[in-house]
């Protein structure tokens, strides 16, 4: 039996609508997820792997230094008055070197290398890096704080050593060019032959102090970031490639061959999260994105804040802070003991960096108000000083990231050292950094063409197919049954009587009605 033409058209249109439903809402999402799982894994064939190994554009690395405008008064115990100088802008190029794949457990090992170039044009107006800044002497304070914590009986000898190494300093402050303390380095004189300076310098060589580089003639050069510049980091990091399971991509599983740290307590020693340069796809808003910082030896777990967009791509914004170790059970294990945590918003970096420093949010944002009251000149603002990531949830791509951390030090107060006996003992800021990532137009367009344009086309096409297919099916069915529908419509409004031929012959006009008498008209 051959179908009527109208039903054929209806069947074809219905098939189009059904295909739109199946392809648009079932097949395409499945194909997309399958393809993304392949593309987002760190296999040698993917673009993600190439970009993960060497970011093809520079990150923004900004440094803000706190200049102590009343150093002489602070030496006598006064409240520091600070003036922020910056940003000093550096172009930061990141790459991973000595990369090795391990097929047996789906991991990669690598080391990091960062290269910094000073960019005066992007720095604050007038800053050249040659400005003299006045800050607490990081190296001198570091020596005193470390000995006071670990070997307090040795403080007297350290005092003599500092007088020899630093030529009888008048106070605990450093007056130095900005670029010297940041990258170029300042000379630490270890050529003295007296016992105390010589013994101290020998210990420095043996322990390998962070930021210290041995120079000829028994000299050291000290800077904050100089040892990182164009230097291969000695730590070997192991992460998951995500080929077996894309949700594990970038997950840190070991550092220097060890699957756990030994510097904290309990679960804080675990490696949780990715290495911060790649994240898994398909992460819902209800879940946190986790990354492990090898610089700070801890995991950060930003939480969802709001919907955002970047260059036409919808993103989710996640934010984070240092945390409150005393009152957050998940973070308490970062304290040496449960009841000896630093104030809210501070993290003791000594176990990680081997230097007596504290990390916080810039300007003590989200920190104990008491910290802010100990200094003048700080103005915390979440827009300028917060940590945030604009994250594309389908691919797991960080579109915009702003990592902001402030480094602080304690003005040690002790009667065993003349230079330290009148200090306040408070924790004060030294500088803060703003490391920023923003995908440029080239990579945003690449992401759009590979993912979002096809996704939008399919999104429009599926609705077109369902809408017009359904409409075509309805029209075809209506046309096929139009005569029957019309008869039904007529029968509902008109009564029809069946008349036989015999009845027709017997009918006359009277059946219809009797004749009426003409109306009379009076003339």
Swiss-Prot record:
GO BP terms in the entry: sensory perception of smell
Glycosylation sites: 67, 229, 440
Cleaved signal peptide residues: none
Keywords for the protein's UniProt record, in alphabetical order: Cell membrane, Disulfide bond, Glycoprotein, Membrane, Olfaction, Receptor, Sensory transduction, Transmembrane, Transmembrane helix
TM regions (residue ranges): 12-32, 459-479
Pfam families: CD36
Molecular function, one GO term: scavenger receptor activity
Segments on the Cytoplasmic face: 1-11, 480-523
Entry keyword Disulfide bond: yes
GO cellular component: cytoplasm; plasma membrane
Record bears the keyword Transmembrane: yes
Entry function: Plays an olfactory role that is not restricted to pheromone sensitivity.
Protein name in UniProt: Sensory neuron membrane protein 1
Lineage, uppermost ranks: Eukaryota, Metazoa, Ecdysozoa, Arthropoda, Hexapoda
